[in-house]
Amino acid sequence: MNIKNKDNLKITIITVCYNSEKTIKTTLGSVANQTFEKIEHLIIDGKSTDKTISIVKEYSHVKKIISEPDKGIYDAMNKGIKIASGDIIGFLNSDDLYINNEVISKVVSEFKKDPLLDACYADLIYVNHVTYHFH
C-alpha cells in the first residue's frame, strides 16, 4: 500500500444492509464505540421497507446513507467503494459487530507498521444462540 502520510490515516467502514432493523443497532454501536477517531462510516441500503433507515439516522457518526434499490450485496459494496474517501476500506455487515472498541485502531496500526501490507483480516467468531465458534 502506498500511503504518503501514515500518521493521518482515515478508514472507511462500509455497511451494506437491507431490512436489518433487528441487527443494525448493534453494528452501528460497535463502530460508534471505536477508539480510533478518523472513521468514515457509510451505510449502503438496498431500499429497506422496515425501520432500518430510521435507526441508522439515530447515529451521528454515520457520514453518508444511500438508500436505493441495488443488484445485491456486491453491487452495494461497490457503491460504497466508489464514494469511500478513506486510506483503508473495510466492510462490516449489518448483522456483524466488532468484538471490542480497539479493533479499528489495531487494523490501522498494522497498516502503519508494514508499508507492503495491502489487506488484512481477522479471526471470526460465529455466534448462534447456544455456542460460539472461532475460525
State the predicted function of each range:
Residues 1-32:
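N-proximal low-complexity "stem/linker" segments adjacent to membrane-targeting elements
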Residues 89:
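Short aromatic/hydrophobic "clamp" motif used to bind/position activated sugar donors
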Residues 22-25, 50-58:
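Acidic helix N-cap motif at the loop->helix transition within catalytic regions
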Residues 38-47, 66-67:
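Short beta-strand/loop segment that forms part of the nucleotide-sugar
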